[in-house]
Amino acid sequence: MSVPLLKIGAVLSTMAMVTNWMSQTLPSLVGLNSTVSRAGSSEKITLFQSPEEGWQLYTSAQAPDGKCICTAVIPAQSTCARDGRSRELRQLMEKVQNVSQSMEVLELRTYRDLQYVRSMETLMRSLDARLRTADGSVSAKSFQELKDRMTELLPLSSVLEQYKADTRTIVRLREEVRNLSGNLAAIQEEMGAYGYEDLQQRVMALEARLHACAQKLGCGKLTGVSNPITIRAMGSRFGSWMTDTMAPSADSRVWYMDGYYKGRRVLEFRTLGDFIKGQNFIQHLLPQPWAGTGHVVYNGSLFYNKYQSNVVVKYHFRSRSVLVQRSLPGAGYNNTFPYSWGGFSDMDFMVDESGLWAVYTTNQNAGNIVVSRLDPHTLEVVRSWDTGYPKRSAGEAFMICGVLYVTNSHLAGAKVYFAYFTNTSSYEYTDVPFHNQYSHISMLDYNPRERALYTWNNGHQVLYNVTLFHVISTAGDP
């Protein structure tokens, strides 16, 4: 290999190292890494003030999508105490940006010159090969050709000189970047020592107060029902589907029961996603058939009405056995006092924030809805209320925070029309509309864990989020 070719090889190797340094080492030198990014994100949360600095929770509500919202008053902030350091940090970042732009220019020029060097390398290899094969006698014509070729190589010297200049520039930029990196590290350390930990403590304190807020938001008066969210279209016109109201958040199993009478097959899907896809499920075969669609899953067990009886059955999924069954005194059954849509819906079981409930009717109550609180272990009636609302005029019903909400129809145009408050044994007429998308609701149940209404609507499994009205008193309130 000739000396010029060796020089070009050295230049190419040097430029490869420079390119690698620009793409890998430069970002870490200027501090453009995950640590700096986290610090920047932390600065955004300085709005959260600790209680002793004057902010306070003054309202709380629930968004239309069902999420808990707590509103806090933030005191007016004076000029940031770290303005000097912030300005210095911005100046340093501008310098880093300028350095980065200079490096981009060098990289572009290097790429252009590299293409030229590669073409010259091909020419020099051709000359080297001709010199090696030439004999002792070289004609004047051959000398002229060699001279012409060497003339073509003359511009290469200026390219190499430019490489030398670029190398010096890179060395200078690298030194500047090192200085900037040191300054950034010092600022980062100072802000981390005096700011980030304090911010983290404030955020933790705020999270604790928001958690307390969420606990207080557990109950409230129903003021709105969201638009329907169709999860799946599966099964016949009537049925029920549900999740366990007492399960931990990691347990997202879904139970599916198609039909409204004489059914025994219960499908258990591992997750809501599996339910949507119709996969990963097991089958439970109940020892006694069910009636209606008012079933509920509570703390690992299914509570349902035994077909052609007023018997409540508690079936445990894990042991696949009936733990207890008991007659509900005086309760009508076999389409004696169903909802307006029929379907053997004489007995409807519900769970809210306070426990297990049964909604039904007796002859003694003249067909009016009776609400009974049940002991989930023995199925004994703890207490009962006569709501005075005729069950055959109700489309469906559900419990939220000890309040029974009744719809006036199971068809299109239905709304939540009546509310009975068990804590005061009083009632009121309401006007809370909701969109009955598929025009025939045969199951409507509230899940307190998810604060959502589960609905079976004409063969569609549908969810509704609810809006609850809350009145929250803070520690400073009289």
Swiss-Prot record:
Glycans are attached at N33, N98, N179, N299, N334, N423, N465. Residues 218-470 form the Olfactomedin-like domain. The keyword Signal applies. GO terms for biological process: locomotory behavior; neurotransmitter receptor localization to postsynaptic specialization membrane; positive regulation of smooth muscle cell differentiation; protein secretion; regulation of vascular associated smooth muscle cell dedifferentiation; signal transduction; visual perception. Induction: Expression in SMCs and carotid arteries is up-regulated upon injury or by PDGFB. Residues 86-109, 160-218 form a coiled coil. Keywords: Coiled coil, Cytoplasm, Disulfide bond, Glycoprotein, Membrane, Nucleus, Secreted, Signal, Synapse. Expressed in the brain (at protein level). Expressed in carotid arteries and the aorta, mainly in aortic SMCs. It is found in: Secreted; Synapse; Membrane; Nucleus. It comes from the Eukaryota. The keyword Nucleus applies. InterPro entries: Noelin_dom, Olfac-like_dom, Olfactomedin-like_domain. GO terms for cellular component: AMPA glutamate receptor complex; cytoplasm; extracellular region; extracellular space; extrinsic component of postsynaptic density membrane; glutamatergic synapse; nucleoplasm; nucleus. Residues 1-16 form the signal peptide. Disulfide bonds join C219-C401. Peripherally associated with AMPAR complex. AMPAR complex consists of an inner core made of 4 pore-forming GluA/GRIA proteins (GRIA1, GRIA2, GRIA3 and GRIA4) and 4 major auxiliary subunits arranged in a twofold symmetry. One of the two pairs of distinct binding sites is occupied either by CNIH2, CNIH3 or CACNG2, CACNG3. The other harbors CACNG2, CACNG3, CACNG4, CACNG8 or GSG1L. This inner core of AMPAR complex is complemented by outer core constituents binding directly to the GluA/GRIA proteins at sites distinct from the interaction sites of the inner core constituents. Involved in transforming growth factor beta (TGF-beta)-induced smooth muscle differentiation. TGF-beta induces expression and nuclear translocation of OLFM2 where it binds to SRF, causing its dissociation from the transcriptional repressor HEY2/HERP1 and facilitating binding of SRF to target genes. Plays a role in AMPAR complex organization. Is a regulator of vascular smooth-muscle cell (SMC) phenotypic switching, that acts by promoting RUNX2 and inhibiting MYOCD binding to SRF. This is Noelin-2. The gene is Olfm2.
